[in-house]
Amino acid sequence: MNIISFKSCMIGLMSALLSGCLVGPNYHRPPAPAPAQYKELPDWTAATPADAAPKGDWWTDFHDPLLDELEPMVAVSNQTVRQNYENYQQALAEVKVARAQLFPAIGITASVTRSGGPGYTGNGVAATNGNSVINSATLEGTASWTPDLWGKVRRLIEENAAIAQSDEATLANATLSEQILLATTVIELRIADANIDLGQKTVEAYKDSLRVAQAQGTAGITATPPSAVITAQVALETAQSTLIGLGVARAQYAHAIAVLVGKNPEDLDIPHSEAQPTLPTVPAGVPSTLLQRRPDIAAAERTMKAQNAAVGIAVAAYYPTISLSGAAGFSQSPLQGLLRAANRVWSIGASGTETVFDFGERHAEVQAAKAAYEAAVASYRNTVLNAFADVENDLSGLRILAEQAQALDTAVHDAIRGTQIALAEYQAGTVDYTTVAVAQETELSDQQTQLSIEESRLVDAVSLIGDLGGSWSDSQLHNP
C-alpha cells in the first residue's frame, strides 16, 4: 500500500463520514417586540423606511468643520475601537481553528538510529570483537482524524462564526459610540466657546453699568448711594471670575476630544470658534427598521445564535467519538536502499469511546447550555426594548426642547429690552440701581439657559442618530 493510495482511501472515507447527522436544535430568530410606530411620532409613517436611515457620514449634517475633520479619525485611531477590532480578529481566527477540526491532521516522522552491542555488524556478519553496530532509519507519513459524525464540530463552527459576527457588530457599536461621544464633546466645547463669548459680553456690559453708576454719583444727577456702585462693582467682579472659570470646562472638553481621536492632549490644538453646529433634522423611520440598524441589537442576536449552537455541542457529548489513524512509509536497516518498495511499512486503525455513566454530567451540560440560550434571548429582547426606549426619549426630548427654546427666545428678547429700559430709567433718575442689577441678572440667566437648551437639542440630535444606529445596518455583517 503506497502513500498515494493511503491518502486516497482516507479522503474517500472522510467524504463519506462528513455527511453525518447534525444533533441539537437549528437556530430560528425569536420574535422581538416592535411597535408599529413610535409613540412620540403618532401621525408619521415612512413610505420607504430604509430611505429614512442616516446615510454615510452623518456628522456632516451638523456643518461643523471640526467634526468633519475629526470623526473619520475615530475608526482609525481610537483605542477603544482598536481593542474591539482585535477582539473581532481573534474571533475570526477561532472560526478557522474550529473549521480545521473537520479535516485530518497530517504529519511526517523521520528517525535515524545507530546502535551497538554484542552480536553482528550492520551487514549481518558476526563481529570479530564481540560487538556490533546497527544503523536503521524510518520515514513515515501519519494521519489522524476524528470524523464529525454527530455535528459537534459543525456546531462549534456555527457557534464561533456567530461569535465572530457578534464581535463584528460590537466593533461597529463601539465605533458608533465613540463617534457619538466625540460629536457630543465637540458640541459641549462649542457651547463652552459660546458661554465664553457671552461671558466676555457680560463683562463689557457690566463695565459700562459700573461707569454709569459712578458717573451718576459724580454728576449728582440723582442720589446714588455708595451701595449702587458697590453692587455694580461686585457684579462685574463676579462676571470676570465666572469667565475665567469657563476656561476649565473648555480645556477638559479639548483634552477629551484628543483622547477620542487617539492623540495626546498636547498634540491637538482646537482654536476658539464663534460658529455653532447646525441642528439637523433626523428622520426616525419606523420601529421595525431599528432591528436591522442598531449594531448592539445585531450583536445580541448573534450571541443568541452562538448559544443555540452551544446546545448542539452539549447534545453531541451523548454520542460516541470515533477516531481514525494511519501511517505509511519506509523502514530499513541498514540505511542503504531506504526508499525501496520492499521497505514499505503501513498501519491503519480506528478507535471509539463512549461514556456509559457520568452521574448526570452531560444532562447538566445540556441544561446549562439551554439556560444560557434562554438568557441570551432575554438579553436580546431587553436590548430591543431599551433601543425603542432610547429613541422615544430622544424624540420626546427634541420635541419638548423645541417648544422650550421657542418660549425662551421670546424671554431673552424681552430680557434684553428690559435691561435697556432699566438702564435708561436709572440714568433718568426714576429707578435705583437695584432695578438695573435685577434686569441684568435676568438677561444673563436667560441667555445662559438659551445656550444650555441649544446644547441639549444638539446633543439629543446626536443621541438620536446613535440610537437609530447611525448609517449602519446588519447587511454589513460578513460571513466568516
Regions found by a protein language model. Give the residues of each.
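Regular, well-ordered alpha-helical segments
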Residues: 93, 100, 111, 169, ...
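Periplasmic alpha-helical coiled-coil/stalk elements that build and connect Gram-negative outer-membrane
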Residues: 153, 169-286, 397, 401, ...
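A glycine-biased, small/acidic residue-tolerant capping/turn segment at secondary-structure junctions
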Residues: 272, 413-438, 462-479
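Alpha-helical heptad-repeat coiled-coil segments that mediate oligomerization/polymerization in large
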Residues: 225, 387, 391-394, 429-433
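Short terminal targeting/anchoring segments
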Residues: 430-452
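Amphipathic alpha-helical coiled-coil segments
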Residues: 81-84, 91, 160, 167, ...
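Small/polar-residue-enriched beta-strand and adjacent coil segments characteristic
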Residues: 23-26, 57, 63-73, 82-85, ...
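Terminal intrinsically disordered/low-complexity segments used for targeting and assembly
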Residues: 2-76, 123, 161, 247-292, ...
